Every structure is written in structure tokens, then in C-alpha cells.
């Protein structure tokens, strides 16, 4: 049985299993196995590393930060790149216009932010559909991700869920921070010792048993585990694997000129979201103009401006962009 078949079998068993205190241990074991198999599959399909870019995707890092544009085909990523950086990326009324990674540089508040226009990804990208592997590999190396969605498309929420799932499958965690958990391997044996500074209600009635089983799944039979916050099985698995990328992500609902004001208001209330229209210049201005989108991108990148002065000279208090 291949890795994909094993993954589907575990997913089917998880779907059949009711979630309660009695099944918590079993579900934890299944989640650990599923994460291990997905990791094996990703490494296998990525040629052993999971970080290669592929032809047309190896772009030298430039500027103070890097942000990747992720989305389905024909949602306006190429036009958006031009609005942010004055870089021309071919745009057309048909899908899959962009076939490689197109870089541009956005200048904002004295900083240079590299913006990468990536080809549209489709469902199954994490397992190699389209050029999904290359696109997601670039996203893993970005400092932040801008997910672009077409506000006028049917199934908008499903599109968002698909993109989130594809990124999560390859170990990208959006708008999360690494859990405060430490796993220390021991050489002298002694089994798994689990301690926590807070109650672990999400690990079921016997957290230590669940932790031991998860570590055993990854052949860790002698280790100390210390949790300083309440965690889930998925978070513990992420810590054990140690190859997760935690990225700030902003969702841009583009083309709001094609929907009603009520729908715009509803989208604007979504977490980590901004609404706009590249064509109408709503919340998205010219490359050197300040606008709502650039302000949000700056905020999510977490950049800090540092002012210096020459030794012995008075400080220059004049504000410059």
C-alpha cells in the first residue's frame, strides 16, 4: 500500500470515529500517523528536501522582507503586482497566465519589500497538481503571505478553505505562533516524561498517555516534554516534526466592484482580511502612493524602523520617506 492510500485510509477512519473523551487517545494516534505520512509524501515529492524552487522559481532575495502572492488562477495577482511595484507581469482574461515566479519591489516607509507574483494554485497543489510544489516552496521562504481571492467568484469561502488546507498540508501555519512546548531527547533512557504548567484539557483525560503515544509514533522513546501552555495534538505533532513554518497571512478580497455593498461589508469583517479592487483603485493605489493595503502589509510583516545618527552629531529629526 502506497503512502497516498495509507493517508486516505487514515482520513476515512478519522471521519468515522466520533470525537469524545473515550476516543481522544485513538484520534491522537491517528493524527500523529497522518502528519508523519503527509510529511513523508511531501519530502518524497519535493526530491528529498521540500525547499527547492524549480526552474523559473529560484528568485534571489532582495530588499528588507519578502511577501508571496498566493491564490487561484485569474484572481488579479499579476495586476496587483503592477499596482504595488510597477513591475509588469502578464495578465489576461484566461487562467494560468503567469507560469513562473515574477518578482517586484515595493517601496514603502523607507523600506524595500520584495513581492512575488506566483502562478495560480489549484486543489491538490500540495501533492504536485499544477506547479503547486514550486509555488508552495516559495511561500515557505517568504516572510508573509498575501492570499488573493476573487470576491465575485462563487464558492468564495471554499476557495479560502482550499488554499489554507494546501498550505497547511505542507507545514505552513497561517497567523499562528509556535506553541510554547519543549521536547528534549535523552540518551540514557527513562521513557517519556511529560510535565505541564497549565491543565491540558485538549489532550483528553490522560494527557501523558497521549503524549507518549505520539512520541512513540515518531520513534522517540526517551524524552522530556514540557508544555507551558494548553496545546492540541496537532500542535504537539508540529513541535515533534520541527519543520513547520509560521507565517503571518493577509487575505485580500479583490474585485469588490462586482458584488453588493452588503457582501463587501460581510467580507471586510472576516479575520485578517481587507477588501479592495485593483482596477478601481479601491484601497489599492499606485506604487508610490500610501494606501490601506500597503499599510496592512507593513503591519503583518512586522517591520520596525530604526533611526541612527553619527557619533557626536545632533539627531536629525526630519521625517523622510
Question: Where are the language model's segments positioned?
Answer:
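Conserved G1/Walker A P-loop phosphate-binding module
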Residues: 2-212
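C-terminal-of-GTPase-core extension/linker across diverse P-loop GTPases
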Residues: 16, 22-65, 70, 75, ...
Amino acid at each position: 500500500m502506497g503512502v497516498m492510500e495509507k493517508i486516505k485510509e487514515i482520513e476515512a477512519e478519522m471521519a468515522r470515529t466520533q470525537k469524545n473523551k473515550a476516543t481522544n487517545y485513538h484520534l491522537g494516534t491517528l493524527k500523529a500517523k497522518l502528519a508523519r505520512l503527509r510529511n513523508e509524501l511531501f519530502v518524497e515529492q519535493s526530491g528529498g528536501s521540500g525547499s527547492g524552487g524549480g526552474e523559473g522559481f529560484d528568485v534571489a532575495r532582495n530588499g528588507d522582507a519578502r511577501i508571496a502572492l498566493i491564490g487561484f488562477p485569474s484572481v488579479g495577482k499579476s495586476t496587483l503586482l503592477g499596482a504595488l511595484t510597477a513591475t509588469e507581469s502578464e495578465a489576461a482574461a484566461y487562467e494560468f497566465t503567469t507560469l513562473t515566479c515574477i518578482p517586484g519591489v515595493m517601496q514603502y516607509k523607507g523600506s524595500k519589500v520584495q513581492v512575488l507574483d506566483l502562478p495560480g494554485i489549484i486543489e491538490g497543489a500540495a501533492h504536485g497538481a499544477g506547479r503547486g510544489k514550486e509555488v508552495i516552496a516559495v511561500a515557505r521562504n517568504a516572510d508573509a503571505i498575501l492570499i488573493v481571492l476573487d470576491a465575485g467568484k462563487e464558492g468564495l469561502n471554499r476557495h479560502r478553505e482550499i488554499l489554507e488546507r494546501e498550505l497547511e498540508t505542507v507545514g505552513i501555519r497561517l497567523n499562528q505562533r509556535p506553541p510554547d512546548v519543549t521536547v528534549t531527547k535523552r540518551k540514557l533512557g527513562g521513557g517519556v516524561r511529560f510535565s505541564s504548567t497549565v491543565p491540558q484539557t485538549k489532550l483528553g483525560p490522560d494527557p501523558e498517555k497521549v503524549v507518549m503515544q505520539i512520541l512513540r509514533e515518531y520513534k522517540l522513546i526517551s524524552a522530556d516534554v514540557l508544555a507551558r501552555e494548553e496545546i492540541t495534538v496537532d500542535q504537539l505533532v508540529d513541535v515533534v516534526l520541527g519543520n513547520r513554518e509560521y507565517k503571518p497571512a493577509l487575505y485580500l478580497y479583490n474585485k469588490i466592484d462586482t458584488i453588493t455593498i452588503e457582501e463587501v461589508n460581510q467580507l471586510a469583517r472576516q479575520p485578517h482580511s481587507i477588501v479592495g479592487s485593483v482596477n478601481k483603485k479601491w484601497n489599492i493605489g499606485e506604487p508610490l502612493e500610501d494606501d490601506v493595503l500597503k499599510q496592512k502589509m507593513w503591519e503583518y510583516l512586522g517591520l520596525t524602523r530604526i533611526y541612527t545618527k553619527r557619533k557626536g552629531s545632533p539627531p536629525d529629526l526630519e521625517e523622510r520617506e
